[in-house]
């Protein structure tokens, strides 16, 4: 009887050992790691998307401010000190934290890539009708180029796509100055540790 019990115990022990060994075979460990990798990847993706939405939420009011500065000449000026340049355009000294063109550019480049700026905003500084320029060491604005309007951005409804290690794309709905509902596709690029706008395309079709 004792011999029979001993044999049964030995058989159970052998079976348990075999099961444990099977769980620790390369294929089993690989399956466990694979399962962990998938769940971890899902978690990272979710966090990255949430982080991207937060970036858009914080960034859009600032980005829109610069859009208005460069495209609508929105910086306040002292009209009592206006001058007329050699091309016949009226310029007034800017009354803001930006006292020179260099200081304006330095702040702008915190939020936009240089490549984007050179192909968009900075083009409005380049010729004889420049929207802004330094006169006698101070920033002046072309008051003949002023336009009105403001876009209202709904960052709570933005859609994030194309997430990579170096950036993402955000589609953000907005209400334009004509009260038309539209959207913009904005590409953010990681530049020296900061997500900056590298592309900004306005969809002019009403939605």
Residue positions per predicted region:
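Positively charged n-region of N-terminal signal peptides that target proteins for export
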Residues: 1-5
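Repetitive helical segments and hydrophobic/amphipathic motifs
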Residues: 11-13
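C-terminal motif of bacterial Sec signal peptides marking the signal peptidase cleavage site
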Residues: 16-19
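Bacterial signal peptide processing site
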Residues: 21-23
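Mature, Sec-exported extracytoplasmic domains of Gram-positive
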Residues: 27-207
């Amino acid at each position: 009887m004792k011999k029979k019990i001993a044999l049964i115990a030995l058989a159970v022990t052998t079976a348990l050992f075999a099961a444990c060994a099977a769980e620790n075979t390369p294929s089993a460990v690989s399956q466990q790691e694979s399962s962990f990798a998938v769940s971890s990847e899902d978690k990272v993706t979710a966090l990255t998307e949430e982080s991207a939405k937060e970036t858009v939420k914080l960034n859009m009011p600032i980005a829109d401010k610069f859009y208005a500065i460069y495209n609508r000449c929105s910086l306040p000026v002292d009209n009592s000190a206006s001058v007329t340049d050699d091309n016949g355009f009226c310029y007034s000294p800017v009354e803001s934290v930006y006292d020179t063109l260099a200081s304006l550019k330095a702040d702008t480049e915190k939020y936009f890539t240089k490549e984007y700026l050179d192909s968009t905003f900075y083009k409005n500084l380049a010729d004889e009708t420049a929207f802004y320029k330094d006169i006698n060491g101070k920033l002046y604005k072309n008051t003949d180029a002023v336009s009105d309007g403001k876009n209202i951005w709904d960052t709570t409804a933005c859609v994030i796509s194309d997430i990579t290690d170096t950036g993402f794309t955000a589609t953000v709905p907005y209400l334009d100055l004509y009260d038309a509902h539209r959207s913009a596709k904005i590409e953010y690029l990681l530049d020296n540790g900061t997500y900056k706008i590298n592309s900004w395309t306005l969809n002019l079709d009403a939605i």
